[in-house]
C-alpha cells in the first residue's frame, strides 16, 4: 500500500498540472499504515467491514472535501497506469450527463494481455457475467470485439470512476464479496462506459477460491435476487444454489458446498442476522 501511495504521489500529486486537481484517500481496514497525511494524501484507519465498508467510508470522506466532483474507486491489490487516471479525469470533465461512469477493463496480472472483464452484463436481473471474458488483447481480431460496446450493468471496483452527485445510495457496510455488484444493482441509472487505455491488472479470481469466498460469493448473488421484483427470481436463485452445491460436491470440494449451504441459510435468517454480523467476525473464524 505504501508503495502505491508513493508512486501516485510522485507521478501525479506532485506534478504541477495535476497537484491541485487530485486527492488520494487511503482507507485502511487492516493494521495502521505508517504514512502521514498531507500534500493531497489522506490516510484513514477504518474498522474492517470489508471492501464495501472501506469504499463507502472513502466516499463519505470525499464528500466532505470542497470542490470534489468525481471519485475513482481502486483496489489496493491491483495496479494500473497513471495514464488511466489521467484519461478518465479528462473524459469525465467533458461528460454532460452526471450519470456517466467509467469502468476500467480488468486484465490478469499473471497473463497481462488476457481480459477478465470489460464491464459486466446483468442476466435475469441478478445473475451476471463478464463482458469480453478471456479476450486476448494481442490478437488483431480481438480489436473489433473489444470496440463493440454493450449495455454494461455494473463495473468492478478495481477501477470505477463516477460523479459524486450521481450516487443515490451507499452500499451496505457488510463484510461481503462482490460489493461492487450490489452497488451497481442499486444504481441502474448509471451510464457505464469503457475507455481504451483505462485498465487494471488483478490476480485471477480462480486463484482466490476458498471456503470464505464461496460463502461470500453466494451472498452476493442471493441479495439482489431476494430484493428483485422480477418474477421467479427466488426460484432461479434456488436453482442456481442447487447447481453450485452439486458442482462443488461432485468435484469433491465438500467444504465449499457446506459454505454455500451455510450462506444460503444465513441469507434467509432475516434482518437480524445482517445487523448482528456486520463484520462477520464469528463467521470468518
Map each language-model feature to its residues:
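Terminal low-complexity segments of carbohydrate-biosynthetic enzymes
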Residues: 219-285
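Donor nucleotide-sugar recognition loop
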Residues: 153-159, 168-185, 190-198, 212
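Active-site nucleotide-sugar/metal-binding loop of Leloir-type enzymes
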Residues: 56-70
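Short, acidic, metal-binding catalytic loop of nucleotide-sugar glycosyltransferases
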Residues: 4-21
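Short beta-strand-to-loop acidic/aromatic patch adjacent to the donor-nucleotide binding site
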Residues: 67-79
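A recurrent flexible, glycine/aromatic-enriched loop bordering the glycosyltransferase active site
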Residues: 133-159, 208
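Conserved donor nucleotide-binding strand/loop of the catalytic core
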Residues: 37-53, 61
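Conserved donor NDP-sugar-binding/catalytic core segment of glycosyltransferases
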Residues: 83-129
Amino acid at each position: 500500500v505504501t508503495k502505491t501511495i508513493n508512486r501516485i504521489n510522485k507521478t501525479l500529486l506532485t506534478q504541477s498540472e495535476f497537484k491541485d486537481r487530485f486527492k488520494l484517500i487511503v482507507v485502511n481496514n487492516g493494521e495502521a499504515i505508517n504514512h502521514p497525511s498531507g500534500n493531497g494524501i489522506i490516510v484513514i484507519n477504518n474498522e474492517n467491514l470489508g471492501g464495501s465498508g472501506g469504499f463507502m467510508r472513502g466516499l463519505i470522506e470525499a464528500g466532505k472535501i470542497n470542490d470534489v466532483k468525481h471519485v475513482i474507486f481502486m483496489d489496493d491489490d491491483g495496479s494500473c497506469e497513471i495514464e488511466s487516471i489521467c484519461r478518465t479525469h479528462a473524459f469525465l470533465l467533458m461528460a454532460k450527463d452526471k450519470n456517466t461512469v467509467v469502468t476500467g477493463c480488468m486484465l490478469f496480472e499473471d497473463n497481462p494481455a488476457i481480459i477478465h472483464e470489460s464491464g459486466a452484463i446483468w442476466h435475469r436481473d441478478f445473475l451476471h457475467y463478464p463482458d469480453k471474458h478471456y479476450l486476448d488483447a494481442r490478437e488483431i481480431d480481438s480489436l473489433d470485439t473489444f470496440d463493440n460496446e454493450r449495455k454494461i450493468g455494473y463495473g468492478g471496483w478495481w477501477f470505477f470512476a463516477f460523479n459524486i452527485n450521481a450516487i443515490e445510495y451507499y452500499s451496505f457496510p457488510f463484510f461481503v464479496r462482490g460489493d461492487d455488484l450490489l452497488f451497481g444493482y442499486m444504481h441502474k441509472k448509471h451510464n457505464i462506459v469503457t475507455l481504451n487505455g483505462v485498465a487494471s491488472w488483478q490476480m485471477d479470481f480462480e486463484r482466490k477460491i476458498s471456503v470464505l469466498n464461496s460463502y461470500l460469493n453466494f451472498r452476493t448473488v442471493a441479495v439482489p435476487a431476494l430484493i428483485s421484483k422480477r418474477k421467479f427470481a427466488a426460484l432461479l436463485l434456488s436453482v442456481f444454489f442447487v447447481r453450485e452445491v452439486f458442482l462443488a460436491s461432485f468435484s469433491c470440494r465438500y467444504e465449499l458446498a457446506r459454505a454455500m449451504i451455510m450462506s444460503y441459510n444465513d441469507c434467509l435468517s432475516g434482518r437480524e442476522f445482517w445487523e448482528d454480523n456486520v463484520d462477520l467476525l464469528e463467521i470468518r473464524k
